[in-house]
Amino acid sequence: MDENKQKALAAALGQIEKQFGKGSIMRLGDNRTMDVETISTGSLSLDIALGAGGLPMGRIVEVYGPESSGKTTLTLELIAAAQRVGKTCAFIDAEHALDPIYAKKLGVNIDELLVSQPDTGEQALEICDALARSGAIDVIVIDSVAALTPKAEIEGEMGDSHMGLQARMLSQAMRKLTGNLKQSNCMCIFINQIRMKIGVMFGNPETTTGGNALKFYASVRLDIRRTGSIKEGDEVVGNETRIKVVKNKIAAPFKQADTQILYGQGFNREGELVDLGVKHKLVEKAGAWYSYNGDKIGQGKANACKFLRENPAAAMALDTKLREMLLNPAELIVEEPILSEMPQEEEL
């Protein structure tokens, strides 16, 4: 670029920053735009599948799946992980179904968690937008999109038709929220439910509620499914769970994580450490015995998990080694939301 063009560009950049604030325009190679801050999901397998070590700050995330698949558990685990590193979290409980006792068991500090139980969908989204604009909140969870009922539907009669009302409400909210979340570096997680499309002969008949806007605006979309039961004798103590990364704007998508959710405990972290440790040769397995750093840690997986549970320093060291081995920052893709590509109201 010649000198006159450089001067003109510098003057234009200076004018833009003066008018709209510092950081309103920058070069893509600037380090500030390349760093993606993430928060652990509480599951090592999922953090690795996401490629960045967790879910990204300043972005919209969608978690969806069938009933009782672990959607709320996943978000509560993330809230607990965020609180452990000093983040402030809010939970907008549109379903009016949050169990504080269960949240506490998962490690959530319920005394510090902000909770709202809004009456209408518009109220829920306004509260979310106000929290994001405050700059004081780091993580907002909305449970769930299906329960965000428009005011007109609540005030109307049973049987009234409100075609596309919720989709229009969400589309408008996404346009407002995206910029505010980015500026305040606040993550917003939408929990969503599954519905069936009628008359689909080929392809997947499943879809999520609330129209297409959320699909476009979300930087990460997670599909969580229960694949089996975990039994101790005849008693079912948890679920085998598979989480697919359906969309990912910060690393390679379409990876999946197989994990276990234990009732009343959340993710089976020690089980993940043992399985991944054996797979990547950090934990040795000879017959039924497991060894770590040359020392036997248990006969059978249950005893190996018990050892790691009772020795958090060893568990943390193994977790750190696995993250260093399996998370490659060079693979990260930083893709900012492009407003011109977002769906407008007629595309709902």
Curated annotation (Swiss-Prot):
Cellular compartments annotated: Cytoplasm
Record's keyword terms, sorted: ATP-binding, Cytoplasm, DNA damage, DNA recombination, DNA repair, DNA-binding, Nucleotide-binding, SOS response
UniProt-listed InterPro entries: AAA+_ATPase, DNA_recomb/repair_RecA, DNA_recomb/repair_RecA_CS, P-loop_NTPase, RecA-like_C, RecA-like_N, RecA_ATP-bd, RecA_C_sf
UniProt GO MF annotations: ATP binding; ATP hydrolysis activity; ATP-dependent DNA damage sensor activity; damaged DNA binding; single-stranded DNA binding
Sites where the protein binds ATP: G65, P66, E67, S68, S69, G70, K71, T72
Record-level GO BP terms: DNA recombination; DNA repair; SOS response
Keyword Transcription appears in the UniProt entry: no
Main localization of the protein described in the UniProt heading: cytoplasm
Listed GO CC annotations: cytosol
Family membership: Belongs to the RecA family.
Function: Can catalyze the hydrolysis of ATP in the presence of single-stranded DNA, the ATP-dependent uptake of single-stranded DNA by duplex DNA, and the ATP-dependent hybridization of homologous single-stranded DNAs. It interacts with LexA causing its activation and leading to its autocatalytic cleavage.
Annotated protein name in UniProt: Protein RecA
Species of provenance: Vibrio anguillarum (strain ATCC 68554 / 775)
